[in-house]
Amino acid sequence: MICSDKVHEILYGGDYNPEQWGEEERQKDMQYLPEAGVNIVTLNVFNWGMLQPDEEHYDFSELDETVQMVTDKGMKICMATATAAHPAWMAHRYPDILRTEFSGMKRKYGARHNSCPNSDTFHKYATRLAAKLAERYQNQDNIVAWHIGNEYGGICYCENCEKAFRIWLQKKYGSIEKLNQVWNTHFWGHTFYDWDEIVAPNLLTEHFENNRSMYPCITLDYYRFQSDSMLQNFIDESAEIRKIIPDAKITTNLMGFYKELDYGKWAKYMDFVSWDNYPNAGEPEAMIAMKHDLMRGLKPGMPFSLMEQTPSVSNWHNYATLKRPGEMRLMSYQAMAHGADTIMFFQMRQCKAECEKLHSAFISHVGTNNTRIYKECQALGKELQSLGSEIPGSLVHAKAAILFDWNNWWAI
């Protein structure tokens, strides 16, 4: 839950990317979204390249227009820091920012989740952008939450990470002798005499398959280290925002049973837990329920936010199945029944092009409010409005619990 005196109702809305569209479409959005009961939009998730054209210059003019546009319609804002995908110029000039895959392949610019979490370049510019956003919008009263990054993930195996891994190990074990003892390095002659001899465990070193390590002790510590590295990115951006907005409510969107990150540890640094629910077609309802319960349990005594779900089709599943009439409503209420008091979607208007152009939205490529999906979203929005202020912040005390631990998961 966004514990804020600015929030007194169930928040309903989702990701909005008007920079992909022209003025005519934006004006229609500002009619259709409020009519659907939308009272919050997430802005600026992937705008880093638009906001920062080079090392020293920033351009917030288009974001300013969007903020004003949704504010005029009475909507609240979840403001993202845009650091989920670095700009092309940054990768070109500072290749240390590029992530290395498990195979040892060094990435070039492209896609997203392509930043090394231990790159000095990434840290410098990401924290600077977070600070500039906080400074610019600190007095924007309808910003009720700040969204760091997006769906953190993507383990890196580059030289930046190897160097940082050695420092992390020194802090954990204190001496190389202690590390040798804990890692049982007498096995297969792995005794280390210098920290610089330690390398990242991947297909080039200790693995013969993705989940099959010949030295599980090394791999387990590397998982811990990478989770901590990405968490530090989150913490550092959060700190820049809090310097300017001490009472900011800060989160990032988690992904259920996502193995790469220790969400139990992450949740301690999040003001409220939010997550993205994208079940596969035919996924058992009990598994979806368990994911909701996992998210609810990360911060005991608090509801969580459903940050993303799809109104109908997910573009990236093996089978792009339409949700049946009423299914989106059912899944939204399932989330609420398990502790959500924020129901949000990806996204408000369907992408103009590229890989998510077939991912559904409130407003489809037809561009009108006369579609089944829009009408279902509108009906749900009206229902949520009728619930008033009774549900946000409410709790149900569980009589049973399931223990789930990422370290055990990694070790299996």
What are these regions (language model features)?
Residues 198, 202, 247, 256, ...:
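Carbohydrate-binding surfaces of carbohydrate-active enzymes
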